[in-house]
A protein has these predicted regions:
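Signature tryptophan residues that serve as conserved aromatic anchors
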Residues: 27, 31-34, 96, 102, ...
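Active-site helix-initiating loop/hinge in glycosyltransferases
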Residues: 26, 69, 277-278
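Conserved HGGG/HGGXW glycine-rich cap/lid loop of the alpha/beta-hydrolase fold
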Residues: 9-60
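Conserved residues in the N-terminal Rossmann fold of short-chain dehydrogenase/reductase
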Residues: 2, 12, 50, 239, ...
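N-terminal cap/lid segment of alpha/beta-hydrolase-fold proteins
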Residues: 1-7
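Catalytic active-site module of serine/aspartate enzymes centered on a nucleophile-bearing elbow/loop
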Residues: 261-294
Length: 294
């Protein structure tokens, strides 16, 4: 699908005349990460669009870092809605896809009917460029800081793609040095499912996804005009009980900023990859919430 000047690989499910729902994946994932959600949503009557985001899988991966800024990514999402002929759509995202869903709803509220984030809550604009704050409070080894230097994280992550994708640890400078740590297939993936990711990232590398993180300060600069804007659409937030993101991005950061948060739940026994780890409760929450927003 040609949108916003690039080709995106997009899977479609459900009736062509159903309400449009766009599922936005995170890093290091693909549209494939929503495989447990697409059929239940389609069976409930929704037209489900599932892209590989720019820089991932079968989609184009522009070279320039600034081509992955949040306003550019949001226009990709608008292009998907335009393709579907939808004035509005519901956005559901996980990890970086959650940030993209929230920010698209924030930047273009007239195009987003409802918005859901998994693992990553909406965070209001920081008082200063966030990368400096991360360096000060979380250190140079914090994964987002470690991702900044072009080529460094790529070399470490691409050294053994299977180990990278199978590891349960957050990638950071210390992880890169610990090359002998075991990396069994995660319990929520079959070996064949893991191989889908391995094949895709062996082909594409990790640069596209890393470039999302390299725009953090640029995103801060480009969102100054909407800094005080609230997200007023019907919203949902789900996080896993064992998700490490809760330690530095708790749901409470949304207080006063997401004004119609209808669902805010912690999924027991789930970690960061909750839509793959615990699809049944995730799907139940999504379907009930979607019914409220139809």
């Amino acid at each position: 699908m040609y949108v916003n000047g690039i080709e995106l690989a997009v899977a479609e499910h459900g009736p062509a005349d159903g309400p449009v729902v766009v599922l936005l994946h995170g890093f290091p994932e693909l549209g494939f990460s929503w495989r447990h959600q697409v059929e239940p949503l389609a069976a409930a009557g929704y037209r489900v669009l599932v892209p590989d985001l720019r820089g991932f899988g079968g989609s184009d991966a522009p070279e320039a870092v600034e081509e992955y800024a949040i306003d550019v990514l949001a226009r990709d999402v608008l292009g998907l809605l335009d393709y579907a002929g939808a004035e509005q759509g519901t956005l559901i995202g996980h990890d970086w896809g959650a940030d993209l869903a929230w920010k698209t709803a924030w930047l273009y509220p007239e195009r987003v009917r409802a918005v859901a984030g998994l693992s990553v809550p909406f965070a209001p604009r920081a008082p200063a460029p966030p990368l400096g704050l991360m360096r000060k409070h979380l250190g140079e080894d914090f994964y987002i800081v470690w991702f900044q230097e072009p080529g460094v994280a790529e070399a470490a992550l691409e050294r053994d793609v299977r180990r990278t994708l199978a590891t349960a640890r957050v990638w950071d400078a210390a992880w890169a040095e610990d090359r002998d740590a075991p990396a069994p297939t995660p319990a929520f993936l079959t070996e064949a499912e893991l191989q889908v990711y391995v094949d895709a990232f062996t082909q594409s590398g990790f640069r596209g996804g890393l470039n999302y993180y390299r725009n953090i300060d640029r995103n801060w600069e480009r969102t100054a005009a909407v800094a005080e804007r609230r997200i007023t659409q019907p919203a949902l937030f789900l996080t896993g009980e064992r998700d490490p993101v809760r330690g530095f991005m708790p749901a409470a950061v949304m207080d006063g900023w997401v004004t119609d948060l209808r669902v805010n739940e912690v999924i027991p026994d789930a970690g960061h990859w909750l839509q793959q780890q615990t699809p049944e409760p995730v799907n139940a929450h999504l379907l009930a919430w979607l019914e409220l927003t139809r």
